């Protein structure tokens, strides 16, 4: 928004109107919500760029385009609930970093299931005077069109400003050649170079590193043991993490806010930038022109006031996630509304919602072995009994016979002396393990050997969590046309949009075999660290629980030949000014976390926008 008094946005900023969400929010400098019935007389509400969605991908577009001088509006269906830093990671509190299991409840509270088959359980013990249904209920996300045998039952979305980045694991590995989509045809070296350039920039936005846990005893216990057991066969390292260690006991986890500060602009820190965030606003459809060559406007709905508005822009970017991008497009006349009909394919984006992928997931938890725990104090000289005056723990710094570095031994010595009541030699605030062996052709799955909070996997209070190691292995899924995400022409979701429905099964053949091999690999590897935790034996988890849904609006070079929706600049085929961002663009079978790859594609998309669209003039008169 301009700071010039001659700019109509300046006058509008001085008006008293705010969206209902903005009126009740405690965050400062929330924006006005433009609309034809609320605007200052004579003003024309138009942005250079509108972005739907405020997660890391939307924030990548915002960072690139706001910094390049574009006037940008961002709309999100969720509200601001992450504290002073809008869109920040909710794990960035001392409370959760001291007890990671408490964060499980935060994640569970944020996730909303996408498609839930109707519960056919009949309650036949109601009082005869109570109203009783003759059919099954359809509220709370229940979807009578969902086949429970072909569902992604664990698939869920997060509707808050910042999206899933407010509670994600921050794992940001790069895809290797086998997982990546091509950006450069017929030149593998040039494609490698292009991906390296984009990945490097994306990693800088996320502050990705591989050494935040280098002085964790538990991390090194697991890492060194696995490296020893698989010497010459597999490589182990820290999981690449979007995070910054602020102190030995506190990590700042990256989020959408790390990529782009979601405060409105201009402000004192960015006096020459133009950006507005509109929370609690549902984007319902984009309006196509008569030639189906560009988008003319975006229809939005203030979820608190109930008002509806039409927003105009030069460029429209949808980054609302793999499900909601597709939902918005279908509601706008792209793809096909209703159950797919192979004999009557849609004219616009016939591959929309087809060839979807989701990773298989195996999970278990182990309790570290006696051998590993005893090795923690192997350099200590222990005299006496804990609790007695004669008790002492010492070591010889720098001794060539030491098995551990001095920082390790100093922590162990101090803990054993200061907490003689504790049977474990591991300090209470020792950081968790964050280990991986990356996806490779001989073992085509991604691994996370760590201790973190998910919507599952909390540890009971009777087990000390310092002993626990979580094992999560993620398998790739081949894209198949029959695996689909489609949207009902009869039923709506809680936001009055077409109800999403899955038609999905893990394909037979390579996908299924690799999933079974992955399970075997996890069982063998985890047994080298310790025994299984009762209740967390090796198991396949619900389809969709990974929350890495991909391929819903696939990327490719040719719409028909590649069965895709967007080109390698993330621009929708046939449309000059409509762009899609997120994991829905990724058309390949991948096992690793896809966020960094989706961000890299967004950076490339922004480069195209900057080359082909000119920002509106900006004046710098004093406000």
Curated annotation (Swiss-Prot):
<feature type="binding site">
    <location>
        <position position="448"/>
    </location>
    <ligand>
        <name>substrate</name>
    </ligand>
</feature>
<dbReference type="InterPro" id="IPR012814">
    <property type="entry name" value="P2OX"/>
</dbReference>
<protein>
    <recommendedName>
        <fullName>Pyranose 2-oxidase</fullName>
        <ecNumber>1.1.3.10</ecNumber>
    </recommendedName>
</protein>
<comment type="subunit">
    <text>Homotetramer.</text>
</comment>
<keyword id="KW-0574">Periplasm</keyword>
<dbReference type="InterPro" id="IPR007867">
    <property type="entry name" value="GMC_OxRtase_C"/>
</dbReference>
<dbReference type="InterPro" id="IPR051473">
    <property type="entry name" value="P2Ox-like"/>
</dbReference>
<dbReference type="GO" id="GO:0050660">
    <property type="term" value="F:flavin adenine dinucleotide binding"/>
</dbReference>
<feature type="binding site">
    <location>
        <position position="450"/>
    </location>
    <ligand>
        <name>substrate</name>
    </ligand>
</feature>
<dbReference type="GO" id="GO:0042597">
    <property type="term" value="C:periplasmic space"/>
</dbReference>
<comment type="similarity">
    <text>Belongs to the GMC oxidoreductase family.</text>
</comment>
<keyword id="KW-0560">Oxidoreductase</keyword>
<feature type="active site" description="Proton acceptor">
    <location>
        <position position="548"/>
    </location>
</feature>
<feature type="signal peptide">
    <location>
        <begin position="1"/>
        <end position="28"/>
    </location>
</feature>
<keyword id="KW-0732">Signal</keyword>
<dbReference type="Pfam" id="PF05199">
    <property type="entry name" value="GMC_oxred_C"/>
</dbReference>
<comment type="function">
    <text>Catalyzes the oxidation of various aldopyranoses and disaccharides on carbon-2 to the corresponding 2-keto sugars concomitant with the reduction of O(2) to H(2)O(2). Plays an important role in lignin degradation of wood rot fungi by supplying the essential cosubstrate H(2)O(2) for the ligninolytic peroxidases, lignin peroxidase and manganese-dependent peroxidase.</text>
</comment>
<feature type="modified residue" description="Tele-8alpha-FAD histidine">
    <location>
        <position position="167"/>
    </location>
</feature>
<dbReference type="GO" id="GO:0050233">
    <property type="term" value="F:pyranose oxidase activity"/>
</dbReference>
<keyword id="KW-0274">FAD</keyword>
<keyword id="KW-0285">Flavoprotein</keyword>
<feature type="active site">
    <location>
        <position position="593"/>
    </location>
</feature>
<feature type="propeptide">
    <location>
        <begin position="29"/>
        <end position="38"/>
    </location>
</feature>
<dbReference type="InterPro" id="IPR036188">
    <property type="entry name" value="FAD/NAD-bd_sf"/>
</dbReference>
